[in-house]
């Protein structure tokens, strides 16, 4: 009987904690040095105010452990960027970047920033992969 309250309390605690899951999905081919860009599918969402898809990217080395960073959104143990993508117009707004020496800081007025054309093979690959799966993303 003493276990029932303990189990109930533990269950509430587990459900109250936020899930910190990471599903890094590669969107570029590895370079000759084994570097590859990926995006965190668990961090991606549709911004309710702008309609843009917000996505966190990171560069990692294929075969390294840990392969990708950051360990959580905003943690400064990886190198990457956060973008707001417009899938129809094929453009993006850089929202912020991070590195071990610079924690992630999202620009406060990013929605008012002028978008940049998604150019280059890496941008095209990111747009293709993220936009193809955008219907399943949550809106926040």
Regions from the PLM with identified roles:
Residues 16-18:
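N-terminal signal peptide c-region/cleavage motif recognized by signal peptidases
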Residues 11-12:
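Repetitive helical segments and hydrophobic/amphipathic motifs
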Residues 20-81, 86-140:
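N-terminal secretory-pathway/extracellular module detecting exported/lumenal segments
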Residues 1-8:
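Bacterial N-terminal signal peptides that target proteins for export
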């Amino acid at each position: 009987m003493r276990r029932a309250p303990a189990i109930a309390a533990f269950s509430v605690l587990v459900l109250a904690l936020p899930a910190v899951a990471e599903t890094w999905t590669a969107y570029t081919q590895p370079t000759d040095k084994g570097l590859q860009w990926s995006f965190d599918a668990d961090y991606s969402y549709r911004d309710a105010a702008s309609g843009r898809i917000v996505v966190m990217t990171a560069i990692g080395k294929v075969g390294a452990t840990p392969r990708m960073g950051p360990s959580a959104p905003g943690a400064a143990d990886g190198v990457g960027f956060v973008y707001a993508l417009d899938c129809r117009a094929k453009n993006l707004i850089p929202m912020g970047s991070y590195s071990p020496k610079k924690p992630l800081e999202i620009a406060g007025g990013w929605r008012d920033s002028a978008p940049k054309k998604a150019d280059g093979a890496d941008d095209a690959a990111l747009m293709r992969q993220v936009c193809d799966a955008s219907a399943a993303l949550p809106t926040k």
